[in-house]
UniProtKB/Swiss-Prot annotation:
GO MF, any single term: structural constituent of ribosome
Listed SUPFAM superfamilies: Ribosomal protein L22
Protein's recorded name: Large ribosomal subunit protein uL22c
Similarity-based family: Belongs to the universal ribosomal protein uL22 family.
Organism whose genome encodes this protein: Chaetosphaeridium globosum (Charophycean green alga)
Amino acid sequence: MINNTNSNISIKAVGKKIRISPHKMRKVIDQIRGRSYEQALMILEFMPYKACNYVLKLLSSVAANANHNFGLNKSDLFIEKIIADGGPKLKRFQPRAQGRGYPILKPTCNLMIVVKVKS
């Protein structure tokens, strides 16, 4: 999605059904919210969490979109908005004794990143 008003360009990328809980994803995205693209890359590269790989992949995608579609320089971008919401839950069952089964809900999350050009 592209919003272009008064030469304020914001570029958005969305990742859906990512197999990690939104709680774990928010632990990572809170560290990079409002930072520049280059600072966010540095932070994500050295954080020891699984969620960093998903955020890094989507962040590089939104930067590539900005570069390809608008010719914007990646070093001029900063993260305006980043949100991790809950996605659909995968429903599984754990077999238990005497024919019972306990439900297991495996969470997924939807990640949205919006970047803007530094003014």
